[in-house]
A protein has these predicted regions:
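Short beta-strand/turn micro-motifs at beta-sheet edges
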Residues: 68-75, 132
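Oligomerization/assembly interface segments of phage tail-like spikes and tubes
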Residues: 75-91, 100, 138-149
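Short acidic, gly/pro-rich beta-turn/loop elements at beta-sheet edges
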Residues: 54-56, 95, 153-157
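Conserved short hydrophobic interaction patches
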Residues: 13-17, 103-110
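Short amphipathic alpha-helices in soluble, non-transmembrane regions
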Residues: 98-104, 160-161
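Acidic-leaning, charged glycine-interspersed low-complexity segments
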Residues: 95, 105-153
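Small/polar-rich, solvent-exposed N-terminal microdomains that initiate assembly or binding
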Residues: 1-69, 164-182
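Structured partner-binding subdomains within large eukaryotic complex subunits
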Residues: 128-148, 155-182
Length: 182
């Protein structure tokens, strides 16, 4: 799942839960490489892939291939993605971002996550980043949302239909030979 796909899934969820209508993808640039100006008023940015980690070991599925003498192997890795969410301006940024905690229990949110094959792990403790800007306090808050999803990497390999073997002592004396299937 790429950055834009994750953003398109999360944007309506964040809009609905926080009540902020302007939710944009973080770190956008124009075609000339310059950053886009920030929106006026209260807005939220989402960086869908702040970091990507794995959970445990990948699940490996093996099936007989439609190709003769082959085996289909599908490696399915469980991915944990850290999503950075920032609320800017408005009246109470910390309250807006704290609404994301446990929002996965809402039926509309859990349905959207399930439809898109995403799991909701948790939300970090919201950070109050309000600072004085040009003599005026500018509201800002941040949290991280941790999501699960599964990737798949399928490959077709040749199957081993038979194998020969030989067992020898270190001096070269043959103890046994054979083949499987025999």
């Amino acid at each position: 799942m790429n950055r834009l796909e994750l953003f398109n899934i999360l944007q309506p969820i964040v809009k609905s839960v926080t009540g902020v209508s302007t939710v944009i993808l973080a770190n956008q640039v124009q075609s000339d490489g310059t950053g886009i100006p920030s929106p006026s008023g209260e807005y939220i940015t989402i960086e869908p892939k702040q970091s990507v980690a794995q959970r445990g070991q990948a699940n490996i599925h093996r099936n007989t291939s439609a190709t003769p003498l082959s085996l289909d192997v599908d490696v399915r890795a469980q991915i944990i993605v850290e999503v950075d969410i920032n609320v800017y301006r408005g009246v109470d940024a910390i309250s807006r971002v704290s609404r994301l905690q446990e929002c996965n229990k809402r039926p509309d949110v859990s349905s959207a996550l399930r439809t898109n094959k995403l799991g909701w792990q948790r939300v970090s403790t919201p950070n109050n980043l309000t600072r004085m800007q040009s003599g005026n306090p500018e509201q800002r808050a941040q949290c991280y949302v941790y999501l699960y999803y599964e990737t798949t990497d399928a490959v077709t390999i040749n199957s081993i239909e038979s194998a020969s073997y030989g067992i020898e002592y270190e001096d070269g004396t043959v103890v046994a030979t054979g083949s499987v299937p025999d």
